[in-house]
């Protein structure tokens, strides 16, 4: 396979891994990177779907002991059953609204103005959330009730709007609903597993006609790059939030929103839904 194509796969895999679990939206970054690398055709979009699974696996690997414990106790331990039920409840809002409005959102909201506006608006939400008084009532994920899970699921549903950031919506939603930084961040990671797995398989099924065995090497490079970078990013974020808030990500979102508007206004990037 073309070494240049493999290099593009490596770069995009790293971009996916570094942005998937930070509150900065992976979608906007992949669009920009894909266009700069001239890899934004249907083949490139399918590639983005494939490498998402690498990022998912990174979270599964990081929390493998916890997840195995939950799996073993799924039919016998109340704590494990509560954890699974909370994830299911939190997953439902995005799944239902995505099926109902996904096509309309892609057709009408996937444009540079919406993406940039959402980036910037999301930044101000983060700044506001960080400046308000935090009343923490939930220190760990295990303390969450089904209602808490539903609230975070509703927050995650805002990620259907391009540029919102799934992780950003759930983490900041968690802070607003009284979760500690660690609990909000970890639940966002756990919720990513069913959410991204279902989204990945659904998109792969829709685009199955584009699947080609000749692209296996490219997918493998991107998958590994996404896995490694996402794993390192998850580890880093857990350390970062122990001593920092999310304000820096807000300022980054504002800067990136301005970049999106500039690239669109001057025609530097082909911001298109299809």
Curated annotation (Swiss-Prot):
Major localization listed first in the record, in broad terms: membrane
Residues annotated as signal peptide: none
Ranges that cross the membrane: 4-24, 46-63, 82-102, 109-129, 184-204, 218-238, 249-269
UniProt EC number: 3.6.1.27
InterPro entries in the cross-refs: UppP
Catalytic reaction annotation: di-trans,octa-cis-undecaprenyl diphosphate + H2O = di-trans,octa-cis-undecaprenyl phosphate + phosphate + H(+)
Enzymatic class: hydrolase
Protein name from the UniProt record: Undecaprenyl-diphosphatase
């Amino acid at each position: 396979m073309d070494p240049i194509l493999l290099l593009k796969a490596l770069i995009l895999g790293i971009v996916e891994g570094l942005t998937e679990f930070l509150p900065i939206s992976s979608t906007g970054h992949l669009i920009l990177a894909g266009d700069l690398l001239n890899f934004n055709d249907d083949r490139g979009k399918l590639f983005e779907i494939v490498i998402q699974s690498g990022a998912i696996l990174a979270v599964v690997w990081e929390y493998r002991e916890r997840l195995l414990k939950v799996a073993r106790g799924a039919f016998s331990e109340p704590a494990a059953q509560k954890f699974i039920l909370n994830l299911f409840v939190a997953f439902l809002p995005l799944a239902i609204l995505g099926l109902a409005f996904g096509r309309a959102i892609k057709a009408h909201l996937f444009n540079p103005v919406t993406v940039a506006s959402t980036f910037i608006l999301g930044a101000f939400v983060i700044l506001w959330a960080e400046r308000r008084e935090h009343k923490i009532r939930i220190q760990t994920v295990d303390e969450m009730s089904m209602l808490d899970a539903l609230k975070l699921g509703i927050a995650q549903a805002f990620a259907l709007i391009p540029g919102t950031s799934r992780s950003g919506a759930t983490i900041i939603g968690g802070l607003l609903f009284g979760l500690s930084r660690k609990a909000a961040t970890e639940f966002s990671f756990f919720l990513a597993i069913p959410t991204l797995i279902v989204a990945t398989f659904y998109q792969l099924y829709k685009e199955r006609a584009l699947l080609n065995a000749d692209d296996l090497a490219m997918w493998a490079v991107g998958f590994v790059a996404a896995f490694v970078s996402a794993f390192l990013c998850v580890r880093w974020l857990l350390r970062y939030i122990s001593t920092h808030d999310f304000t820096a990500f807000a300022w980054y979102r504002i800067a990136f929103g301005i970049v999106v508007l500039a690239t669109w206004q001057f025609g530097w990037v082909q911001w298109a839904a299809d």
